[in-house]
A protein has these predicted regions:
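Residue-level detector of alpha-helical secondary structure
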Residues: 256, 557-560, 567, 571-578, ...
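Short edge beta-strands and adjacent turn/loop segments
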Residues: 579-595
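Basic- and hydrophobic-enriched, low-structure N-terminal and domain-boundary segments
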Residues: 1-78, 82-90, 95-97, 134, ...
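Conserved short beta-strand edge segments in small beta-sheet-based binding/regulatory domains
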Residues: 618-628
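Acidic, low-complexity, intrinsically disordered interaction modules
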Residues: 592-613
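Conserved ATP-driven motor cores of ASCE-family P-loop NTPases powering translocation/secretion/packaging/pilus
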Residues: 385-387, 391-487
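P-loop NTPase motor domains
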Residues: 51-57, 61-393, 408-411, 478-483, ...
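C-terminal edge-of-domain segments
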Residues: 630-639
């Protein structure tokens, strides 16, 4: 007797009892889509969201306005631009409720196909174009820092000029608040530039390079306040050139000597002292890391685009605006600029949202970030995806694979991003990504038919049995074989399976790009501030007493008298040290801060210096200098909390 057995798995065509026993995964039905999402007429869209579904004539679209952000997963050739970005721009530009857009556009394709459509529909169209810098708008990435520091200078000046004591206190507090915000902005920018993918094994070098950048930005601002440089000299390229010039031994000593004249409590002094006093080998290693991160600002195209600003950083929240950032995708160095620009604009827009009554931007914003995982990590991305929606901002992150996202942010942070976003699957060539999508879809329960047959010379018996088994809704291999299809995972309901649709199918799309003004690229060397330009005599010329009114001169003199009390204890201590020796005591003022200067022909012993330092170091910054043959002691009161 011969026995044959055949097992036949089938998708059941009739109702299966206990149909969820091994899994209940399925795709969303049209009735569920119609219930969960808002239907709009393509020609008359009221509020744009993510396009979940279309009718067969592409005249109606169902929008998802609930999912806060989206991650698009598509390898090269998946049609991200023509089936996702351009259609979304068509809906966005034509919607009655206007939103702004920030679009990274590596090839310039999005600009070429959508810019005229945006302009014709009332949008301000801006470009930051590193491919064609002669056609680009300008964006000095230090602009928010400069503006905040100028507020500090303005309020400080007002605190001197006004006679009302209550107002003096008010302006002084505003000045200190702006100074603190300036320092926060400096730290944030330096972190964006110096941050590595994931976390470096030895963060010392990156942290030190960041500290060097913070100090140099602070130094340029202080020189601007003193009147030693002009506003247009405060650029990242100028800072890069200054650091290059300081590598010359003679220049380094000159810079170090000049820095010694600055007071503790200044950004430059506090940040640079520990860096430039490091050992020679350590300092060279720090500047090597600094140079590798800052080298992109040597690029003539980058220097021209970032030499000034011709629009406000928060314009996207004030009026319907589309900003295209066009970067050469063949050179990943430029992607650093995308991260910096996104980080800066996002921070300024959050500040704008926070002063609105409802804490939301008047014109809400979609960030369409192509090649997101090719960019260096965006600082505080976890916080961004958690709170951006409440400020009126929605992010669209385009990546090629999950592994690419993990490589940039690490698995933990990458998971936080994914947990806060809907997912759009377009195409993958990697098995790991296909397996992850299959896992997300889950398993369904299907019937499995088993057929047994026995045959002999005299008899034939047949037997068929049916059982239930689990099956992937789509297997990894099936997912990899999909063409012109997409799988959408919104935060509401089951996943959605539909065709990808070209932008030309939609009646709201209008082709064309705008003509941009062509400017001449410049040799900007005349704007660079380098070590050779330092003039020691200029270091304290802001608000020179001789240039102030009599009332303000009197105010400064009164302040000096009041501040003497701050130094009473150390003054008395040093009087005991020098009780049998003639010495001179002077109270001086620099940048509206009083310090105690002591000079004596008697040099202090190492023991005296140690005793003074250990006794008063918590309250004062103390500098000892005897290089001139005199003992000079400069004592600065520590401003606690600043």
């Amino acid at each position: 007797m011969v026995v044959f057995k055949y097992i036949e798995p089938l998708f059941s065509k009739h109702k299966i009892k206990n149909s969820n026993e091994y899994g209940s995964a399925r795709f969303s039905t049209f009735n569920e889509i119609n219930k969960n999402f808002k239907k709009e007429e393509v020609r008359r869209i009221n509020q744009v969201g993510f396009p979940i579904w279309f009718d067969k004539d592409y005249k109606k679209v169902w929008m998802d306005n609930e999912t806060p952000h989206w991650v698009y997963l598509g390898s090269t050739g998946s049609g991200k631009s023509v089936t996702q970005v351009i259609p979304f721009c068509s809906f966005l530009s034509s919607a009655e409720l206007k939103r702004s857009a920030f679009i990274t556009d590596p090839k310039g394709e999005i600009f070429n196909t959508t810019s005229k459509m945006f302009q014709d529909r009332g949008y301000e169209v801006l470009t930051i174009d590193f491919r064609n810098p002669e056609k680009s708008n300008k964006l000095n990435i230090l602009e928010p820092i400069i503006k905040e520091y100028e507020k500090h200078i303005l309020y400080e000046k007002k605190s001197l000029e006004i006679q009302n004591k209550k107002k003096k206190v008010e302006y002084n507090n505003k000045s200190m608040s702006s100074l603190a915000e300036t320092n926060r902005l400096i730290s944030s920018l330096a972190d964006m530039i110096m941050k590595d993918k994931v976390e470096a094994k030895d963060p010392f070098w990156n942290n030190s390079a960041r500290q060097l950048l913070e100090g140099l930005i602070g130094f340029f601002l202080e020189e601007y306040k003193l009147g030693n440089i002009n506003r247009n000299q405060i650029t990242m390229t100028s800072i890069r050139k200054f650091q290059n010039s300081s590598m010359d031994e003679k220049n380094f000593e000159k810079f170090k000597s000049y820095l010694d004249t600055k007071k503790y409590g200044s950004k430059s002094k506090d940040s640079l002292t520990s860096v430039i006093t490091a050992s020679e080998n350590t300092y060279k290693s720090i500047t090597s890391v600094f140079g590798s991160k800052m080298s992109l600002f040597d690029d003539v195209n980058v220097a021209n685009v970032t030499s000034s600003s011709d629009f406000d950083f928060d314009i996207l929240g004030k009026k319907p605006t589309v900003l295209y950032v066009i970067v050469p995708d063949e050179d990943k160095t430029y992607f650093t600029l995308v991260t910096i620009i996104v980080g800066l604009l996002y921070r300024e827009l959050v500040k704008l949202a926070n002063i609105q009554e409802n804490k939301k931007l008047t014109y809400q914003i979609d960030w369409l970030l192509d090649e997101f995982a090719n960019c260096p990590p965006l600082v505080d991305i976890e916080a961004i995806v958690s709170v951006a929606r409440s400020r009126g901002m929605r992010f669209h992150f385009f990546i090629q694979s999950f592994a690419q996202l993990n490589n940039v942010y690490g698995k933990d942070v990458a998971q936080i991003i994914l947990d806060n976003c809907g997912l759009v699957y377009l195409k993958t060539n990697t098995q790991d990504t296909a397996e992850e999508i299959s896992k997300r879809l889950g398993k369904q329960t299907i019937e499995s038919n088993s057929i047994s047959q026995s045959v002999s010379l005299t008899d034939y018996n047949g037997n068929k049995s049916t059982s239930l088994m689990a099956r992937d809704l789509l297997t990894p291999d099936e997912i990899k074989q999909l063409h012109y299809k997409m799988i959408i995972f919104p935060i509401i309901g089951y996943p959605i399976f539909r065709d990808t649709i070209l932008y030309t199918k939609f009646s709201c799309y209008k082709k064309g790009n705008i003509n941009r003004k062509i400017d001449s690229l410049k040799d900007l060397s005349y704007t660079y501030f380098i070590v050779e330009d330092i003039n020691h005599e200029n270091k304290s010329k802001d608000y020179n007493k001789e240039n102030l009114s009599k009332e303000n001169q009197q105010f400064i003199n009164e302040k000096l008298e009041q501040d003497k009390l701050l130094f009473e204890d150390i003054d008395n201590y040093i009087a005991e040290v020098y009780k049998d020796v003639v010495y001179e005591t002077n109270y001086k003022e620099v940048n509206f801060q009083t310090y105690l200067n002591i000079e004596s022909p008697k040099l202090l012993s190492n023991e005296d210096i140690l005793n003074i330092s250990s006794t008063f170091s918590e309250k004062y910054y103390i500098e000892f200098d005897n290089s001139s043959g005199l003992q000079i002691i400069n004592i600065h009161f520590k401003m606690l909390g600043l």
